[in-house]
Amino acid sequence: LYHDVGFMFSLSAVADYRITENRQSKIRGLHAATILAGRYNPTGEYIRAWNQPSWTKEDVSGWVIIDSMMNLPLLYWAGLETGDSRFGDIAVRHANTILRYGLREDGSTNHIIVLNPKTGEFVDNPRGQGFASGSSWSRGQAWALYGFALSYRYTGEKKFLDASKRSAHYCIANLSLNDWLPVVDFRSPEHFAKFDSTAGMAIAAGLLELAEHVDEYEKELYDKSAVKILKACESKFCNWNPEEDGIVTGGTVLYHS
């Protein structure tokens, strides 16, 4: 297992426990949260991303990715369930690190952040799943927008709400340029060529979450933008054939694929 245990167990074991109060599901969720917490580097205040992958010989023990923001609710939940503040503390410290190195001033994001695992010092921002280093992978934007909104939900810390808004406004501005259809990378030279429906779905979900935490004058912008994205994606990507399992087509793993 690796950093994505939050994606995996929040939507399975934790969700089942919340609905059915199944004790085994609670145990599985807490076990997953403990595994995730075990990936925390206290010096750099980050949760390590991948285990050593086969596609690089470079040491990745200092690699952090924007996707990790979506794993933090598992830690927040575990802290509330157990009363152990260490879970939530790790989540907050990791979110602060992502805020410091992953979210740019204009609301765009870096996919990968490389830190020195011994000192916590910043080293690099590799390309990741986007077009290039310094570009703007759209699904990564979703993870920032949605993830910071969720961190605000659990902590009430305004800096996380502000971070979510920055990412949201960046996404809205870029999506409106292309009829609300999500391209793989908002800064790629082939801006209108490659799409990623999954980025659109995730951005819309993040906008709807964000709308729950703002006043009525702001809420409308996020709600209406989410609906525009969903309608655009439904028109271009959705397959309603009952003979086939998949509904949303047009997903893209990474730009260079």
Cite the ranges covered by each PLM segment.
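Glycan-recognition and catalytic cores of secretory/periplasmic carbohydrate-active enzymes
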Residues: 1-257
